Amino acid sequence: MNIIKRALTFEDVLLRPCYSEVLPKQVKIHTKLTKNITLNMPLISAAMDTVTEHRAAIMMARLGGLGVIHKNMDITSQVREVKRVKKSESGVIIDPIFVGPKASVAEALEIMAEYRISGVPVIDSDRKLIGILTNRDLRFENDYSNLVENVMTKAPLITAPKGCTLDDAEKIFSKNKVEKLPIVDEQGRLEGLITIKDLKKRKEYPDANKDSFGRLRVAAAIGVGQMDRVDALVEAGVDAVVLDSAHGHSKGIIDTVKSVKEKYPNLDLIAGNIATAAAAKALCEAGADAVKVGIGPGSICTTRIVSGVGVPQISAIDECAMEAKKYGVPVIADGGIKYSGDIAKALAAGASSIMIGSLLAGTDESPGELFTYQGRQYKSYRGMGSIGAMQKGSSDRYFQQGTVQDKLVPEGIEGRVPYVGSIKNVVHQLLGGLRSSMGYVGAKDIEDFQARAEFVEITSAGLKESHVHDVTITHEAPNYKVNQ
């Protein structure tokens, strides 16, 4: 029997405290998602159909992280989710949604509802701005067959010239008491749009993760050989794609990485999941811009039990990160996170960012079903290897595409997690724990954290001592749950 080495996970280790001159509030938590994309905080919401669609992705990006839209939907639906994130907020909207004057009120309302916007510019066939239609114009309009040109606020409108900065726009908003500011060229053609909502969001979420156009960043999951999905996502403006598989160290994944990077060399591509240095080396050499680590650590994943395969997560992160570092490729730790301390341990072990599923599945923004059980609220949460998820489309992730439904071999379960409110509150607690850890170690940023970190291996008695013991909890803390 060939036993290579002893492997450890989060509960097997603790970080040693060090001399510190750094307070938790002073630490910097920006990091790399990929070789080319920076995050303002190191958390990513998982590409799972009970965790991340546009609502979760929007909030994660506003908080400085990122959401990965799952692929358990057709291409058109996934593209729509990406567009909802990209159009949810902008500095200057360079491709604003618009309508023509002959469109009906019903058509305009449908567009506004789809993109969750409160108004649209109205342009003629030459793209000249001839009016704007807002909720104010529609408030008392009952005839939905009426034409937009009969209801809209007609030109002349308050506008701004090309090159208008957000600071200039704020002055115009303040002076004219308007909510939308169209950007026009010298001929009066629509070139962009700035909204008061986006300026408010800019102040409310100063650490938002945005692209060069001021739009929120978003990633989306793809499968092996799904070039048509990649094409559509690139057209929609996706910032990164995540090649999602249970076994990233396989020919199909490596070939897909090469194909995508050959066609779209400037598209950031994250590949996984892996758990060994050899896998990290193969994906980095194939062209991956980040690698995702985790074979079976997730709370709803049964891969290690069903297949007998996997590597405990701390050891997997350490091994993959040391290899990926040779190529300048960041590592994403995916799975097994139960507490904020696990995030700190994963980063200290070499990960650049952390993908989270179960801790976000119970939030307002997750797409899972909200229900009540024994007087307490829960949301549904399932693994992408569960029977339900595989039947809906994720079977290719486990190399079972084309398998009839009653012959599927699941590698995950379906369950429930407690309802926890907004993502904003959950992330606040998780980042608070990370900042505290960095303060204990004396690290000013994540790179310094990794350089300073020293681990000790603990016994089962040490783990028991680490948790609450010899007392009955009467009031639960927001960052420590008894049933975890």
Model-derived features with residue positions:
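Alpha/beta catalytic cores of nucleotide-metabolism and tRNA/nucleoside-modifying enzymes
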Residues: 1-21, 99, 161, 286, ...
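Glycine-rich phosphate-binding active-site loops on the catalytic face of alpha/beta enzymes
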Residues: 62-77, 238-250, 289-307, 337-370
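Short beta->alpha transition motifs characteristic of CBS
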Residues: 69-74, 117, 121, 128-144, ...
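Active-site-adjacent beta->alpha loops and helix N-cap segments on the catalytic face
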Residues: 25, 74-83, 141-145, 165, ...
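Catalytic beta/alpha-barrel core
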Residues: 69-72, 98-99, 119-121, 159-161, ...
